[in-house]
Amino acid sequence: MSKDWEEKFRPEDLQRIRGFRLMDDDFMSKCFEENIECTEMVLQIVLGRDDLKVEKVAIQHQLKNLQGRSIIFDIYATDHAGKRYNVEIQRADRGAGAKRARYHSSLIDANVTEPGEKLENLVETYVIFITEHDVLGKGKPIYHIDRVIKETGENFGDEAHILYVNGEYRDESPIGTLMHDFSCTNAKDIKYRTLSERVRYFKEDEKGVAAMCKAMEDMRDEAALAARLAERKEVASRLLKKGAMSFEEIAEISQLSVEEVRALAGKRGA
């Protein structure tokens, strides 16, 4: 039965919200936004640690490397001991490759160190990929990746951890239950109350639905802006290829700045 307030929103948005799961990163990001309780519960289950206490959590958190290239983390959390946790939701297998996990880990290290700080003080880090499919294909609920000394089999002890959580895994264990919950579209089917209440808010409460609709509107605006920028860059690239106009003329026609045109020209010449 529909609610009277649902008439305020676009039917296609409501339909999309009904189909969302925590395995959808846009929806998960909204559910975990500024929500320490949900983040803490997921980390406790994945890591098997009841003592873990999250102090800060950021959603869609941007980190940059030394060359200025940036990447956006789905969830970036800090616990009471200063340890860092990056949780990524990946529905596509290709987005959860080993090199990407390594890159995420390196970015955390680069961004938590201060100039002159001793490297021995590097904090312990965890990069956790929750994948819709069993990307490593061995049927395990969780895969723990740590550096080891090949000759002895001993842990190297650099405290940089990578974990893959198998979203297909189902049983009555905490991780099996969690992966079940991440695949539910209906809040009443979610077994962990902390997650169920959060999902219900964004699917069934007027204020929560309004927040989700606003988030989707913002995403549509961002996508439209990105498409326009791509079109302008394509126009500028074609004009640069012809080589008959100045940067200023190309900027005027393409509606890019002169600096953006220069940057495009630099990439062409690289």
Which residues fall in each region the model found?
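Accessory alpha/beta interaction modules
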Residues: 1-158, 171
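Short, charged alpha-helical interaction segments and adjacent helix-coil junctions
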Residues: 2-18, 78, 85-90, 176-270
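Pocket-edge structural micro-motifs
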Residues: 129-132, 166-167, 203
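Low-complexity, glycine/alanine/valine/leucine- and proline-rich hydrophobic stretches
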Residues: 149-158, 163-168, 178-185
